[in-house]
Structure formats: C-alpha cells, structure tokens
Curated annotation (Swiss-Prot):
Keywords: Hydrolase, Metal-binding, Metalloprotease, Protease, Zinc. This is UPF0758 protein HEAR2468. Belongs to the UPF0758 family. Residues 102-224 form the MPN domain. GO terms for molecular function: metal ion binding; metallopeptidase activity. It comes from Herminiimonas arsenicoxydans. InterPro entries: MPN, RadC_JAB, RuvA_2-like, UPF0758, UPF0758_CS, UPF0758_N. Zn(2+) binds at residues 173, 175, 186. The keyword rRNA-binding does not apply. It comes from the Bacteria.
Length: 224
C-alpha cells in the first residue's frame, strides 16, 4: 500500500510536521527523504531495506554510488541528494564551530567529527585548528591510512599549526573496527603531539576517537 493511502496521522511527513522529526524512526525519516517507494514497497519499506542492507545509518551515509545503486529504486539522483544533505549538515556544524563555540559546545565538535569520520573504511587523522578565541580556522585531514593504521608525522602538524597561526588544536581520528577505545599507540602519539605543539605555544584541547556512533574523548577521560 502506498503511503498516500495510509491514514493521515500515520504518514511520516505529516507526523514530522505535527510532532517534529525526532519521533520518526530511521526508516520513516528515509521515507520522507525518498518521497516514493517502488512497485510493491512503500517508501517506509524501502527505507527499512536501506538500513538493513547497510547495517546502520553510518553505513548508508558512507556507501559508494555502486553499493547504493544495488538497492532497487535507488540510483545516482538519490545518491546525489543524500550526499548533498550530509554536506549541508557538515557545513551547518562547521558554521557553529566557526562562531566560536568549539570549547563551549563539545557536543557540536563530536557531531561534526562523527559526520566527517564515521563509516570510513580507512583510518583518517584530522585536526581542527583554532584561533585565540577558540573559533575554527580550518579542519584538515592531514593523514590517511589503511583499515588498521595511519602514519602521523608530528613535524607536519607543527608546520601546519604555524602556517594557520593556530592557538590550539583538536585532534581526531577514526577506528573503522568500531571500537572507540584508544590503543597504546594512540596514547603515545597524543602525548608526543602535545609535547611537540607545546614548544610553539599551541595547546592540544582534546583528541577524539570516532567509531560509528561512539566517540572517545581523551580530555573527558583525564588523559591530557
């Protein structure tokens, strides 16, 4: 049955307008995005198929066009729409950080890094360079590695911090394995970067490890 044949109070779009997006399930939110289903399936059914196929929203958001198009009813047009929505969300959070709330809103930093890093099939090391008022200057993906390892060079980070005239930085990388706890190597690297940046009067405010929906904060755990 098409969603247009459902009782109005059960239709995802109408429920969103009346009660807000937070009450909708993942499949219902995707149905609003999709607008229509395919033969024999409503948009909600198709939304459920998408979540089941990719295992999670993070898996869906990081899917390639080829993988995305394997689901009947999905193709380049919907893929482009989804990527545009994700990029708008990233830019919205980036604007919030640039407004000078990096320290006052650690949750915004976490959300931004989750959007940026979760779902990647390789390790990526990014740095948020901040000015003296804790406003974001730039977020730079400085190093990219494999499924289990990324080579990070402190000298390059020091050079970048000087180049951006940064007063402080926030470090972040992802764990494609899905486990957010930092390794011994992560802890050693964090301290090495802290010491190297201290020599040029740049503070390390935090180091986040992103693993899907989980984010580990070195600062929150008292490891800085």
């Amino acid at each position: 049955m098409a969603i247009t044949d459902w009782p109005e109070e059960q239709r995802p779009r109408e429920r969103l307008i009346r009660h807000g997006a937070a009450i909708l399930s993942d499949a219902e939110l995707l149905a609003v995005f999709l607008r229509v289903g395919v033969t024999g399936k409503s948009a909600v059914d198709l939304g459920r198929d998408m979540v089941a196929h990719f295992g999670s929203l993070n898996g869906l958001f990081s899917a390639t066009l080829n993988d995305f198009s394997k689901i009947n009813g999905l193709g380049p047009a919907k893929y482009a729409q989804l990527q545009a929505v994700l990029e708008l969300a990233r830019r919205s959070l980036c604007e919030e950080l640039q407004a000078g709330v990096a320290l006052n809103s650690p949750q915004a930093v976490k959300q931004y890094l989750q959007l940026l890093l979760s779902g990647r099939a390789y390790e990526s090391f990014v740095i948020l360079f901040l000015d003296v008022k804790n406003r974001l200057i730039v977020c730079d993906e400085m190093f990219r590695g494999t499924l289990t390892h990324t080579s990070v060079y402190p000298r390059e980070i020091v050079k970048a911090a000087l180049g951006h005239n940064a007063a402080s930085v926030i470090l972040a990388h992802n764990h494609p394995s899905g486990t957010p706890e930092p390794s011994a190597a992560d802890q050693t690297l964090t301290q090495a970067l802290k010491q190297a940046l201290m020599l040029i009067d740049v503070r390390v405010l935090d180091h986040f490890v992103v693993a899907g929906k989980q984010v580990y904060s070195f600062a929150e755990q008292g490891q800085l």
